[in-house]
Amino acid sequence: MRVARILGTLEPGGAQLSALWLSAELRRHGVATTLLAGDATPAGLALAARYGLPADAYRVSDVLAPGSLQWTPAPDFAGWLGPRLADADLVHAHMVGAWWAAARAVPPHVPLVASEHNQMSWPDGDHTPQAREAARRVDMFFAHGPMVRAWAAGIGLDDGRLRRGRSSVEGLPAGPLPGLPSPRLTFAGRFREDKAPDVLVEALALVAAPPPAYLVGDGPQRGALIRLVRARGLEAVVHLPGWSYEPARYIAGSSVHVVPSREESWSQSAVLGLGLGVPVVGTAVDGLARTLGGGRGVLVPPEDPGALAGALSRVLGGDRPDPAPGRVYARQFTPRAAAAVYAAAYRQLLASRGNSGWASAARP
């Protein structure tokens, strides 16, 4: 089976990693993946190549703008995609800018699968009307969180085409990197407003004698984060080791792992912490509230450094959730389990190819 996988943006990030792990694991199911990207960074291209998936990108730049092809419909991108989809048996496009373009470019007989990994926050203008039109051509839609699922239902996809997205994590089990201090606190993710590393720094400033804190990742807020760390006098506490291919080795053995997000449909970072038996403190937003619910983690309000500081202090003081439920929960999110779900979905769509009326250019 030849699958063209299209990413609206290709950069080091959770949605991209999940798509790369999925593509690599689908090889076991006889799926050969061609990776295409709208906007890509050099680091994103290197990340894809690391998983044996050299990517063809429409645009490459060091920094992705808010109006990137993650969010923005672009007819020129659709035109670029057209000849690159000619040999695909199935197209799976991730992020609205990608599946909007794919809906224009995919041949009428080829199934189109779409995925959304994030809350629809529209940083550069709301394109819901364009998405509603493109959704007529989508044959199956995977939503990776409660809020994006509700949005997808609102544009007409809740008619048998809507599915719960299945993401995955890597790094279970893992041992800590040698030389890391104990106790320590960890964060792993993009340095962006939605991931709220700034809120974590503000919370650390309120914790009495905070332990060393390792904020693993990179992103556009790095400079602002460094300035905030200095302003709060936390230079000796906060460590910024940069992007890591093995964040689990920082998280393993940590005293507490923190997910302070303002928005979070599904957090690889939180699930990784749970799977490693590390206490996880996160915000009660969207899908993260579900992940850490049921006593698996500790939930606090978003954008509340005081509440976050209080929760961190309690966990560091020994008031920790039972790790067993979190470990059990995390086991279902392996790349192998995700690949089985998507391989079955792809085969279902391809088996329907000969059915009368299937895969028209657009639904009425």
Model-derived regions, located:
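N-terminal strand-loop element at the rim of the active site
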Residues: 5-72, 219-220
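A conserved mid-protein helix/loop that constitutes part of the nucleotide-sugar donor-binding site
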Residues: 16-24, 183, 187-206, 220-227, ...
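Short His-centered aromatic/hydrophobic patch
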Residues: 93-99, 116
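Aromatic "clamp/platform" in nucleotide-sugar-dependent glycosyltransferases that forms part
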Residues: 243, 262
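Conserved acidic donor-binding segment of nucleotide-sugar-dependent glycosyltransferases
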Residues: 294-305, 314-319
